[in-house]
């Protein structure tokens, strides 16, 4: 079973991602954080959160969130040797080239527009990459 950390402030998008995993029978244990700060708390075991162990095998990350956005979180994540190798898959409503370039320089594994919902027969690059990361 794969451990997945979903960093997403929208409950609808969280539920949609969960349904997509179930639809494709992707065995997973989903952990959620509602912003980058909460995600770091989970990874580091700070501010009363128990450290998430084992570490997630993949992080699904929204870019636009309150308190600490996805780029700020990704910058801190990549600065830590303990977390630098965790694959990060961006899920966002932003299709701006500047966001894509910023995330590429921080070593993301993939970028997909929301919602993270795949239909049977979907052959998109995002679906193939996500399946590769989660299997």
Model-based region annotation:
Residues 109:
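Short, glycine/charged-rich "phosphate-handling" switch motifs in NTP-dependent
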Residues 26, 54-57, 82-87:
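His-Asp phosphorelay/catalytic-motif detector in bacterial-type signaling
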Residues 62, 92:
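Active-site residues of response regulator receiver
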Residues 94-98:
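Negatively charged, flexible loop motifs adjacent to catalytic sites
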Residues 2-22, 59:
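Conserved acidic segment of CheY-like receiver
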Residues 65:
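Receiver (REC) domain active-site loop signature in two-component systems and cognate sites
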Residues 32-58, 121-122:
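Acidic, metal-coordinating helix/loop segments flanking the phosphotransfer/catalytic sites
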